[in-house]
């Protein structure tokens, strides 16, 4: 099959610009004239609003700028696509990165859409969460699942490693997660308990729920923050992960919370609420043993009306380890065993008072120890 060499990028049916495959397999981008006149920079540090052709300098986003790589699915979605293509006698290697963005089309996270989109099958509606979970396990264990089309339709363009679906509940958009094959059965209950604790610690999160199950303690669900209802219409929000903003490979430890705090201050124009919330997240991740705190787990949302970037609600807060036994993002240079000393140092350097940093860190430590003790033993 011939691979696609260019693709339109749109937002709310407005042409943002064009992606084009170069001879050295990088994907160049240029803004449309309309967007240059009425739009905004979709990636402030990498793609300023200028009339020029931008070419990525790094290779680890498959030749894309980070903002467009954010639209591609992570491990679970990639696995589903690979299985779906194999079932149809095709190989993923036959598809360029632009082909994969075309498959994402209008179904990706955030506000960017890709055209012309490529349909690869829709499947039939499945409403039973336990049934979906069982089929997810079949996929993870390399077994055949007759519901592959439906699993891809529901979760093939999502981020993250764990199986999940994106679905509508009472007119609102939700993400519901299922256990991976290495997870304990209570992984959904644990993430739900973590979300309640995080909220008690003053961390901003979307609404969360524990969906009932007959085969496990429940499935964790969270309302999507990249979708909102406005005048009876679903509006999409443009967003960027820290990995995309800084053009970083999130699989490699390459960031310190000092830099994440600085990024938050610069991007949000020193919004006190967001800077303090980032500090709380850092404290929570340390005390609640969330070591998989990589740069795709921090996101910023753009408000076009106010021309403002804001820190998104927190997500993926749960007990986690890394294969190297440390936090993915170091705390004042310490990834192995950071404590209050390092946390306060990060907060103070970000411009917060030492007494405030000490008080917040201690409050979060006590709250975590009280509410999550059974997970941390």
Predicted regions mapped to residue ranges:
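Phosphate/dinucleotide-binding and metal-coordinating scaffold of catalytic cores
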Residues: 1-295, 299-377
